[in-house]
Design a protein with these regions (language model features):
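Cleavable N-terminal signal peptides
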Residues: 10-11, 21
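Gram-negative and organellar
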Residues: 22-386
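Bacterial N-terminal signal peptides that target proteins for export
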Residues: 1-9
Length: 386
């Protein structure tokens, strides 16, 4: 199973922000039968440690320009969507860190009959990372590609249902002089999940996950295969409570005898509770093995987050998140404890315009030299649609 070492909150925030009346409602344009939806986000932030380092800390103002373009087509039994997101980051006090990111994604859902469904996805990204870089002061320049699909057999209301999934991903770096060459890899994954209905709103599940990591560097100590078995349940018992729980065990076997094989309990928990239509509490917990970083063979990563999103009025919403992570770097004498806090207020100025004020604090306490840091980000964001 794959889990990013620092558990990026980009995905976590999405879990804590379900569709609601206080979000902007983009309007689509009909283009030859397709729904075309453009949006634009502009943010300005002050970041007092944008490289997340312990010494020689750099601060800067950061401007983010993020247009997005969605093209969607759907009929009775299928839907297809293509999204292009070019994003420009301008670091005003560190021009070498400024960069332009690109993301292109396509999704398709096809329902052949009530018992046969297929989901397909493909994504290509090109972006730069300013934190946890291989060389101090130089961005990691990353290119990634991924294709995947899930075939589902079984009607939605059936007693049993089976998902068969497969994916393939490539990770490459554009840094010069061989920087990050040791991290380039191809990843293939096969997943099988069996669902058994326990009630009208509850299903038990049993999942097997196999992942192969092939590093391009000859005789890489990180090339491996990972196998995980999980059991759990998912439920949508009322309009107020939804959740998914998976608990299991994971084993990672390395190709090279010089690296010790690893095993670890693993779990994924996603809970949402809505005591009111305008208020949502979320709980997220993860434990899994991530790929090695900073010279380690692998990272045993544990992360927990609690979130609260509340609409005080029809136009004003607050978002609060608290996250705690523990990371053990296998093959090194290092472990990190990360605390991550976010507080934001969103004002729906118009149907097509949201304004958000946010503050984020990250504190990493590491027992390795030069790996601890604190970081504060103050940000204002304008989200615009048609």
């Amino acid at each position: 199973m794959a889990l990013k070492p620092r558990c990026s909150l980009v995905l976590v925030v999405a879990c804590c922000a379900p569709e609601a009346a206080w979000s902007i409602e983009p309007q689509a344009i009909n283009v030859y039968g397709f729904d075309f939806t453009p949006t634009f986000a502009l943010s300005e932030s002050y970041d007092d440690n944008f490289r997340e380092v312990e010494h020689d800390v750099e601060s800067t103002m950061v401007t983010r320009l993020a247009p997005a373009f969605e093209l969607k087509a759907e009929d009775r039994n299928s839907a297809t969507r293509v999204i292009w997101e070019p994003t420009r980051y301008i670091y005003h006090s560190a021009s070498d860190a400024s960069n332009t990111a690109q993301r292109l994604r396509a999704d398709s859902i096809m329902e052949f009959t009530d018992r046969h469904r297929l989901k397909l996805e493909a994504e290509a990204r090109k972006y730069e990372r300013t934190t946890s870089t291989a060389v101090d002061g130089i961005n990691d320049k990353i290119e990634s590609k991924r294709v995947g699909g899930v075939y589902t057999f079984g009607a939605r209301s059936a007693l049993n249902q089976i998902d068969l999934g497969a994916s393939y991903a490539e990770l490459r770096y554009d840094n010069a002089d061989g920087i990050n060459d040791d991290k380039e890899r191809n990843t293939s994954n096969l997943t099988t999940t069996w669902y058994h209905r326990l009630g009208s709103k509850t299903r038990g599940l049993l999942e097997y996950d196999h992942t192969r990591f092939d590093y391009l560097q000859s005789n890489s100590p990180r090339s491996s295969r990972s196998d995980a078995v999980l059991a759990g349940a998912e439920w949508d018992m009322t309009a107020k409570t939804t959740g998914k729980l998976r608990v299991g065990y994971e084993r990672k076997n390395f190709d090279q005898s010089g690296s010790d094989d690893l095993s670890n309990p693993t779990w994924q928990v996603d809970l949402a509770w809505k005591p009111r239509t305008y208020s949502t509490f979320t709980f997220l917990a993860r434990q899994a093995m991530a790929e090695g970083d900073d010279g380690s063979d692998a990272v045993k990563a544990t992360f927990t987050q609690v979130g609260w999103r509340h609409g005080w009025t029809e136009r004003i919403t607050s978002v609060a998140e608290v996250g705690m992570g523990h990371y053990v770097y296998e093959g090194q004498d290092r472990s990190d404890d990360l605390q991550d806090y976010k507080l934001g207020v969103i004002y729906e100025m118009r149907r097509w315009l949201d304004v958000e004020l946010a503050y984020r604090h990250r504190d990493n306490d590491s027992d390795a030299d030069n790996e601890s840091f604190t970081r504060n980000v103050f940000q204002i964001t304008f989200d615009v649609s048609l």
